[in-house]
Every structure is written in C-alpha cells, then in structure tokens.
From Swiss-Prot:
The gene is nusB. It comes from Rhizobium johnstonii (strain DSM 114642 / LMG 32736 / 3841) (Rhizobium leguminosarum bv. viciae). This is Transcription antitermination protein NusB. The keyword Amino-acid biosynthesis does not apply. PANTHER family: ANTITERMINATION NUSB DOMAIN-CONTAINING PROTEIN (PTHR11078:SF3), N UTILIZATION SUBSTANCE PROTEIN B-RELATED (PTHR11078). HAMAP family: NusB (MF_00073).
C-alpha cells in the first residue's frame, strides 16, 4: 500500500467538468447580480478556479474552457434562448425557470451548438450532473429533456 500523499494531476476531462460547473456559477452570478462578463471571468480566474475560499478548495478547472462557455453564452444568448424556449413545454417560459436552471441550460445549449468536437452524451451527462448538485428530481429531468431535444434538433442525434 502506498501512503504517498503527492497530489495527482487532475485529468483534462475533470478540468472541463470543473470549468462547466464554474461557468454555470458565473452565469448565475451574472444573471442575479448583474455582473459583467469581463469582471466575472477575471474574478473566477484570479480567485476561484483551483483556489481555496473559506476553507473550500475549488477544483482545478480548464480556464480556457470556462472562458469559452461564459463568453460564448453571453455573446450568443439571443440565439440560445429561443432554442431553449422552443424546447420547453408550452406552459413554461424561460423567464419562469430558476436562474440556476437557466444558467445550466444556456451553458449546455452553447456547447451542443458550438462544441461539435464534444459528444452530445458527454455534454448532457455533465449538465444533468450539475443540475443534480443543486436540485433533487424535477430540474435534472428538465435539463436532460431540454438538452436532448435541442441536440436532436441541432445535431440530429440524441444522447447515447
């Protein structure tokens, strides 16, 4: 048995997952607090990604992936929101969703539409897991259904 306490490097996939979570948190903060994209990206890169805050250590994240998601969602929100609204049930408006759910959906839809190099299954699974970190049952199911509908529409493929 090895008692060596050396820190293992975080795998790239895990760094992307951490970047996705941080992007959702940043998008939420922007939505609720009205913070600008440049300010929020600078704050996260300087003080959160891989840093310790109040005794909690944030996972090391792929900073470029984080920037890509946050800036892409902000840049393309007028294109992303109608896709999300169309994928929601008839009686649900995007504005009616919780801010965290909106942030998760916007980030997930951005990746589905703009990151063709990432399989749909990876994107949907990662964002459903993020939803499960914040919510119990209905919201993760909603995230799964909406992202799956949009993936079929945009890429012609469901998650596998």
């Amino acid at each position: 048995m090895n008692d060596d306490k050396t820190e293992r490097p975080v795998k790239t996939a895990n760094q992307r997952g951490a970047a996705r979570l941080a992007a959702v948190q940043a998008l939420y903060q922007m939505d609720v607090g009205g913070t600008g994209v440049l300010e929020i990206v600078a704050e996260y890169e300087a003080h959160r990604l891989g840093q310790e805050i109040d005794g909690e250590t944030y996972l090391k994240a792929d900073a470029a992936w984080f920037r890509s998601i946050v800036s892409g969602v902000v840049r393309d929100q007028v294109r992303l929101d109608p896709l999300i609204a169309a994928a929601l049930q008839d009686d649900w408006a995007l504005s009616r969703l919780d801010s965290t759910v909106r942030a998760i959906l916007r980030a997930g839809v951005f990746e589905i539409t703009d990151r063709k190099d990432v399989p749909v299954a990876v994107i949907v699974t990662e964002y459903v897991e993020i939803a499960q970190a914040f919510f119990d049952d209905d919201e993760p199911k909603l995230v799964n259904a909406v992202l799956d509908r949009i993936a079929k529409q945009v890429r012609g493929e469901p998650k596998k």
